[in-house]
Amino acid sequence: MSNNIIIRNATINDIQHILNIINYYINNSTNDYRYYEIHINELINSHNNSITNNQPIIVATINNFVVGYATYNQFRNRIGFKYSVEHSIYCHHHYTNKGIGKLLMNQLFISAKNNNIHTMIACIDSNNEKSIQFHYQLGFTHIGQLKEIGFKFNQFLNMNLMQIIL
């Protein structure tokens, strides 16, 4: 399937598609700890801030349909963390386990290295075994777990921290 996939920088025209992907996971999983859907203006502002801060938003498309996206932001908003980022990656729920995530992450790694990023952090709900295994396959290591740090769907949630040195 990877022959049909195009990986490129997101444009403003992709925002609604990215929004649909994110909002699906907000509504249907603990992959994202938000309770309420993101509105398009919030994502447009995030997109514009990413451009201003030279932080990528990368999309995967098949036949001009956005099937996944990946991005990163500085891990903490303090100068001492300027070489550390936390990433997000989501694939459309009908397009998981098809190699799209790996293509997105490979491009994200290239972007991070080009921006002199030293390390990338993944914060993953401990019940999301597929994402944990995916990150292991990419070379991330498990560095810890935050116990009962989140709360969603009437339950406390643990978050795994994973890291890769680039």
PLM regions: where:
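A short beta-loop-alpha structural element at the N-terminal edge
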Residues: 5-20
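Helix-loop element at the rim of GNAT/NAT acetyltransferase active sites that forms part
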Residues: 20-37, 50
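Acetyl-CoA-dependent GNAT
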Residues: 35-94, 105, 165
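Conserved catalytic-core motifs of GNAT/GCN5-like acyltransferases
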Residues: 74, 121-124, 136, 141-158
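Active-site acidic-Proline motif in GNAT/NAT acetyltransferases
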Residues: 89-94, 98, 110, 126-127
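Conserved acetyl-CoA-binding loop-helix of GNAT-fold acetyltransferases
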Residues: 97-110, 133-137
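Conserved GNAT acetyl-CoA-binding A-motif
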Residues: 112-124
